[in-house]
């Protein structure tokens, strides 16, 4: 057994405390970007559990058929939330990562475009889904996932992110009629 006071959790909890656990990585993934690294928060069991509980709380009484988790850290949060909410999990992946027939959605980045995909028929039409990602920045990835869910005729009950970067105004580009909840804001 190792001595790791950081690993033991603390009595401190809540958004202010969790914000301190998220570190800034300057010039990642490219110069001029300040990346919000959530992995220190995820690496502490009690902190991860309490942050996840906070993310799940608004959706506990919402009937859901599945959580759609966006690659990559949205997989971790999405799968954990699906378990917490006792519902299914469906991955939303980068192109070429899912076997079989998929639907693909292209979206704009600051410089260029990217794409995400989901399995065709992953869920029946009308299935009620919650879209989950780690960070809301410009909103492109979340909007693309929303578009895929709409193409599959799923009922989108909301979206949840751990971190929202307010300066990038991704929320302003979100669908007004679909709730979007962020646990932490910077």
Curated annotation (Swiss-Prot):
Pathway: Purine metabolism; AMP biosynthesis via salvage pathway; AMP from adenine: step 1/1. GO terms for cellular component: cytoplasm. It catalyses: AMP + diphosphate = 5-phospho-alpha-D-ribose 1-diphosphate + adenine. Keywords: Cytoplasm, Glycosyltransferase, Purine salvage, Transferase. One of its GO terms (molecular function) is adenine phosphoribosyltransferase activity. Its EC number is 2.4.2.7. InterPro entries: Ade_phspho_trans (IPR005764), PRibTrfase_dom (IPR000836), PRTase-like (IPR029057), UPRTase/APRTase (IPR050054). It is found in: Cytoplasm. One of its GO terms (biological process) is AMP salvage. Coiled coil: none annotated. PANTHER family: ADENINE PHOSPHORIBOSYLTRANSFERASE. Belongs to the purine/pyrimidine phosphoribosyltransferase family. Catalyzes a salvage reaction resulting in the formation of AMP, that is energically less costly than de novo synthesis. Homodimer. This is Adenine phosphoribosyltransferase. It comes from Xanthomonas oryzae pv. oryzae (strain PXO99A). The lineage of its organism: Bacteria, Pseudomonadati, Pseudomonadota, Gammaproteobacteria, Lysobacterales.
